[in-house]
Design a protein with these regions (language model features):
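Tryptophan-anchored aromatic micro-motifs
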Residues: 1-13
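Sequence contexts marking disulfide-bonded cysteines in secreted/extracellular proteins
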Residues: 7-9, 46, 106-108
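A short, polar/proline- and glycine-enriched secondary-structure boundary/capping micro-motif
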Residues: 39-44, 64-71, 97-104
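Edge beta-strand at a domain terminus
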Residues: 90-116
Length: 116
């Protein structure tokens, strides 16, 4: 999956990244990301209608010194392609400190291609 972090109000790209997601039959979701300052994420997905899905996931975030920085929660709206091998998505995310107080939020877009 290719991720682009965007300004929520304008859609202007401000950063990019990659991840691998695994959608598990029955509604489970996990992802891995090459960023060493975070854990893999766990979450769930739900079929809405047609080729539209929603997913939520959460992971732990760490500071450069290895101390716990908080959590990030992401909600993603997914549009699956007709052949079910690709998708496009928009997402919102929230970063909370170790006391679960919201610190910041943002938006992202992503594209993904199935592999087996």
């Amino acid at each position: 999956m290719r991720i682009t972090v965007v300004q929520c109000d304008t859609g202007k790209a401000i950063g990019t990244g990659r991840a691998i997601l695994m959608f598990i039959n029955g509604g489970g979701l996990t992802d891995i990301n090459p960023d060493f300052l975070r854990t893999a994420s766990l979450g769930a997905w739900l079929h809405l209608r047609g080729r539209n899905y929603t997913a939520v996931n959460r992971f732990f975030v760490f500071k450069a010194d290895g101390s716990f920085a908080g959590t990030q929660a992401t909600t993603t709206d997914i549009n699956l392609s007709r052949n079910a091998d690709e998708y496009t998505a928009t997402a919102t995310f929230e970063f909370s400190d170790p006391a679960d107080q919201l610190i910041s939020s943002g938006c992202a877009t992503s594209t993904a291609t199935r592999f087996e």
